[in-house]
């Protein structure tokens, strides 16, 4: 029988980090909430040390904040931050298209087609979180095909903010048919090597998602004010 490898401190920290990220995505941790080290440690079945280390990493990403002598809190929803994230997304994603299209081949196009098909299949499903993940997968696959690792890493951080911090509160509001059509058109333009058309479609697509996200947040904020 083989011996079981003992987990290192880094292994436990990574496990805690991924576990907390999963709680964010599943809405088990909500915006503005005080985070209890002990509660998270119990739910993750580990000590508080790796949990605290994981929270420090999440603080760097902007998902939580630390208040001296009070502990960690999740950040509240910020309209200005959402606008900034989508603006930055547009800058990064559109800037990657020239390299993506110039380096396109049959193998890369097949990868993009698979990501597109996965998304189209997911949006027909009742599981909205799967739809969200497949949407991100399509955009990240497209970005990775450019070969620009630094910009791709920045884009991944932006998706983390959108999909973990804001989750279903604002990201399920764009009509599915609109997203489908825009993704299909974007794929077709990339397959045809039409850079200018692909830039136009991608810019328009991100602007549409941004518009619906802003409208959703403003509606939520107005409803909250009305209850006061």
Regions found by a protein language model. Give the residues of each.
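Short helix-capping and inter-helix turn/linker motifs at the boundaries of alpha-helical repeat units
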Residues: 11, 110, 176-177
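Mobile beta-alpha loop/short-helix "lid" or hinge segments that flank ligand
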Residues: 60-65, 158-160, 175-177
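C-terminal regulatory/effector modules of DNA-binding transcriptional regulators
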Residues: 175-228
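Conserved amphipathic alpha-helical segments that form helical-bundle/coiled-coil interaction surfaces
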Residues: 85, 97, 102-168, 181-188, ...
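Alpha-helix N-cap/N′ positions at the starts of helices
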Residues: 69, 92, 114, 178-181
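Short linear motifs at protein or domain termini
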Residues: 1-102, 214-228
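Juxtamembrane/interface motifs at transmembrane-helix termini
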Residues: 52-53, 103-106, 130-132, 151-152, ...
């Amino acid at each position: 029988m083989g011996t079981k490898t003992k987990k290192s401190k880094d292994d436990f920290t990574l496990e805690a980090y991924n576990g907390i990220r999963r709680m964010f995505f599943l809405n088990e941790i909500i915006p503005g909430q005080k985070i209890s080290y002990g509660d998270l440690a119990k739910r993750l079945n580990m000590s508080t040390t790796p949990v605290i280390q994981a929270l420090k990493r999440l603080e760097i990403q902007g998902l939580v904040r630390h208040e001296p002598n009070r502990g960690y809190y999740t950040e509240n929803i910020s309209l200005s931050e959402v606008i900034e994230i989508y603006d930055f997304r547009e800058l990064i994603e559109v800037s990657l298209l020239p390299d993506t299209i110039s380096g396109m081949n049959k193998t890369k196009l097949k990868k993009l087609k698979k990501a597109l098909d996965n998304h189209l299949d997911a949006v027909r499903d009742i599981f909205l979180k799967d739809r969200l993940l497949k949407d991100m997968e399509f955009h990240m696959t497209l970005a990775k095909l450019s070969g620009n690792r630094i910009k791709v890493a920045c884009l991944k951080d932006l998706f983390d903010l959108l999909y973990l911090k804001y989750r279903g509160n604002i990201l399920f509001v764009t009509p599915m048919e609109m997203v489908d059509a825009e993704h299909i058109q974007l794929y077709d333009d990339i397959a045809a090597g039409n850079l200018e058309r692909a830039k136009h479609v991608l810019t328009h697509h991100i602007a549409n998602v941004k518009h619906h996200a802003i409208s959703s947040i403003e509606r939520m904020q107005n409803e909250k004010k009305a209850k006061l």
